[in-house]
């Protein structure tokens, strides 16, 4: 998208693919406390190389990303309302909480700029696949060491591993679908099986439920967006895949519930989650407009006024439910901003399914978004360090893809 010479352009494209692979692969694995710094280093090294090779810099260095305006609007509304809530509470801790949460969106803006400027798809997707493989191996090693302890790989908690795997499923499936090379299809299929195994080692029931629910909602979305464009055979294949995955996830949920000796009793299946939701509702009833304050849920939950009499679990900082967290901490305006963000993202991806030339990739992004959103109903997602950054990284990359596609279409007119 810039006016550098053809030779320089070829070097830049190759370098961008390698750097994107490193960025994606590193960003998926919390192998150290400063893991994301290494991912940023890969981006910055390429950026400096790009600046050097693109001299003299002109306006084309900054790509046209107007196609992502719905996503920009959603981010501004969501985090803007959270920040206003923090200022209204007047505590430094609340402001720092929101700023830290907004910090997780950095990969979105980096990848949007990067992908809108260069075609990094091959490198980025291969980096994601490599990161997924590392997560699988890491999880299997932990499971082998002690099968009774849920695997976490490099994540802070087993449910985060489930979230990370779920974010990557759709794109590994997309790569298997899009290639015509039989050997590559087998390779991607093997990776899918390994990811299924890693998901099992995490023992994350919420991840399984989110996966099956995401498939069902994505199927409904595709039928609505592409009505009249499906052939009967494709519909039956899609229904078969959804039915199979749903059956496997339901079986896994029942097995893990039995393994954890909770059964399907709603009072036990989620630990203290039901108590947390009830306590959160009481908190909101007492603080309807502005909530208890960002980052203050744990403080209020363990206070004598709101802590359940039968509660015994320690160290919780959220109710394992994203809408309820924002309702409790930020009031009615906070949860409204969260839903506005989700609706704008869904609308953006729905439009992409209808208008993009690559509908398979648009469907993969929609599936990843819906799985991530549904998982947020039973656990934390968008406020967690590694899963949150992964989600924004993938969303930013896809938004850059759409921006680049829009740019090329305008040039053909």
Regions from the PLM with identified roles:
Residues 19-22, 42-45, 83, 102-110, ...:
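Alpha-helical transmembrane segments of multi-pass inner-membrane proteins
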Residues 201, 219-269, 278-286, 294:
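A membrane-periplasm/extracellular boundary helix in multi-pass inner-membrane enzymes
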Residues 266-275, 290-330:
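Long extracytoplasmic/lumenal interhelical loops at the membrane interface
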Residues 196, 281, 289, 312-349:
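A conserved mid-to-late transmembrane alpha helix and its immediate loop/hinge
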Residues 30-39, 96-100, 153-168, 206-207, ...:
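Membrane-interface micro-motifs in multi-pass membrane enzymes
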Residues 30-31, 87-96, 148-154, 200-205, ...:
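Membrane-interface helix caps and helix-loop-helix hairpins in membrane proteins
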Residues 1-84, 106, 113-129, 175-186, ...:
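Transmembrane signal-anchor hairpin modules in multi-pass inner-membrane enzymes, especially those
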Residues 23-32, 327-330, 361-399:
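Membrane helix-loop boundary segments at the extracytoplasmic
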């Amino acid at each position: 998208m810039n006016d550098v010479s053809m030779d320089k352009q070829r070097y830049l494209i190759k370098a961008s693919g390698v750097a994107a692979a490193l960025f994606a692969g590193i960003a998926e694995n919390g192998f150290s406390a400063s893991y994301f710094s290494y991912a940023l280093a890969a981006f910055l090294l390429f950026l400096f190389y790009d600046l050097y090779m693109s001299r003299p810099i002109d306006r084309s260095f900054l790509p046209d990303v107007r196609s992502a305006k719905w996503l920009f609007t959603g981010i501004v509304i969501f985090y803007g309302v959270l920040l206003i809530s923090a200022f209204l509470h007047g505590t430094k801790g609340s402001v720092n909480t929101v700023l830290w949460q907004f910090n997780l969106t950095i990969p979105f803006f980096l990848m949007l700029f990067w992908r809108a400027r260069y075609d990094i798809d091959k490198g980025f997707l291969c980096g994601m696949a490599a990161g997924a493989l590392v997560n699988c191996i890491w999880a299997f090693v932990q499971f082998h060491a002690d099968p009774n302890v849920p695997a976490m790989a490099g994540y802070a908690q087993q449910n985060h591993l489930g979230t990370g795997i779920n974010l990557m499923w759709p794109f590994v499936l997309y790569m298997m679908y899009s290639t015509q090379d039989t050997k590559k299809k087998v390779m991607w299929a093997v990776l899918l099986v390994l990811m299924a195994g890693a998901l099992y080692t995490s023992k994350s029931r919420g991840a399984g439920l989110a996966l099956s629910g995401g498939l069902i909602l994505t199927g409904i979305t595709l039928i609505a967006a592409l009505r009249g464009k499906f052939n009967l055979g494709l519909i039956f294949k899609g229904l078969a895949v959804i039915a199979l995955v749903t059956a496997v996830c339901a079986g896994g949920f029942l097995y893990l519930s039995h393994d954890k000796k909770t059964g399907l009793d709603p009072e036990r299946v989620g630990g203290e989650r039901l108590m947390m939701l009830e306590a959160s509702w009481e908190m909101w009833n007492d603080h309807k407009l502005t909530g208890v304050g960002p980052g203050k849920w744990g403080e209020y939950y363990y206070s004598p006024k709101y802590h359940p009499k039968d509660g015994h679990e320690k160290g919780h900082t959220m109710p394992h439910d994203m809408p309820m967290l924002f309702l409790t901490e930020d009031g009615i305006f906070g949860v409204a901003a969260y839903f506005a963000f989700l609706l704008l993202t869904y609308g953006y991806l729905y439009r992409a399914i209808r208008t993009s030339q690559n509908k398979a990739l648009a469907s993969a992004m929609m599936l990843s978004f819906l799985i991530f959103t549904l998982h947020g109903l039973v656990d934390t997602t968008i406020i967690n360090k590694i899963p949150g950054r992964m989600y924004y990284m993938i969303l930013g990359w896809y938004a850059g893809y759409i921006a680049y596609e829009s740019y090329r279409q305008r040039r053909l007119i």
